[in-house]
């Protein structure tokens, strides 16, 4: 059976109950027990959260100053292009977000390491100066477990408690969704003449626009956690 038109083939696929889908990228090593335990712990903490406590999610992101093409709608016979940049410098941003308010703390660093972790945590404490206890959820990167970070946290008067997301589970850290939102708004099909302009746009979005427009963005950056299991997918490759 041959179909001479794309529309005819698409119609056949729909009649066969098929849809055009983009596969999810899932980690190779997923522990169901650890995922369920984390979600249970998180829900318990949130249900008992005091009025003088806050919850933030921390992660690092490394946007690259370069053209990032993405699919979009256009006239049928129109050829689209975006200009390539002259370099591929990379930003190093260590950041945190409060899902309740949309408040963020973002630092630009030479490198993401134990020093940037301490700088970020200190900035969070300063931002939440009247909050008795600040719960910070973050991944298991080695620098988050560094000896100098633990030493800093043990100092008298510190108000931060760290909670680690299970390994290989970026879907359990909502700030990952913020990074996706950032790319959607700032890097897809956009180009910036200089790296400084690129950095300014990224940092302005994360520091100012996200909190200011949180009512618009909050449904895209949520703690609607789910357990991800390879058995629930047909693995293509």
Task: For every predicted segment, state its role.
Residues 36-122, 223-237:
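Extended, low-complexity cationic-aromatic segments
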Residues 9, 57-59, 95-96, 102, ...:
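Mobile genetic element proteins and their domesticated derivatives, centered on retroelements
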Residues 1-30, 54, 61-63:
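Conserved short alpha-helical interface segments
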Residues 79-86, 154-174, 191:
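RNase H-like polynucleotidyl transferase catalytic core
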Residues 67, 114-163:
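RNase H-like DDE/DDD metal-dependent nuclease/strand-transfer catalytic core used by mobile genetic elements
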Residues 8, 51-53, 175-237:
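C-terminal anion-handling pockets and recognition modules
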Residues 1, 16-19, 61-64, 98-101, ...:
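Short, solvent-exposed loop/turn segments at secondary-structure junctions
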Residues 32, 138-140, 147, 163-187, ...:
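RNase H-like two-metal-ion nuclease catalytic core shared by retroviral integrases
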């Amino acid at each position: 059976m041959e179909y001479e038109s794309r529309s005819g083939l698409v119609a056949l696929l729909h009649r066969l109950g098929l849809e055009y889908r983009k596969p999810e990228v899932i980690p190779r090593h997923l522990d169901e027990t650890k995922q369920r335990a984390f979600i249970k712990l998180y829900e318990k903490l949130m249900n008992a959260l005091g009025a003088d406590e806050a919850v933030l999610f921390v992660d690092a992101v490394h946007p690259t100053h370069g053209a990032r093409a993405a699919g979009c709608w256009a006239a049928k016979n129109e050829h689209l292009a975006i200009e390539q940049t002259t370099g591929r410098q990379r930003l190093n941003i260590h950041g945190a977000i409060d899902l309740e308010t949309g408040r963020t703390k973002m630092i630009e660093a030479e490198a993401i390491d134990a020093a940037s972790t301490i700088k970020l945590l200190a900035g969070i404490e300063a931002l939440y100066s009247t909050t008795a206890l600040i719960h910070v959820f973050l991944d298991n990167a080695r620098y988050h477990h560094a000896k100098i970070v633990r030493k800093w946290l043990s100092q008298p008067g510190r108000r931060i408690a760290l909670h680690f997301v299970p390994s290989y589970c970026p879907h359990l850290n909502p700030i990952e969704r913020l990074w996706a939102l950032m790319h959607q708004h700032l890097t897809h099909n956009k180009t910036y003449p200089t790296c400084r302009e690129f950095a300014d746009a990224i940092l302005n979005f994360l520091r100012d626009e996200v909190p200011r427009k949180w009512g618009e963005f909050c449904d895209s950056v949520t703690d609607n956690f789910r357990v991800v299991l390879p058995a629930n997918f047909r693995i293509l490759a």
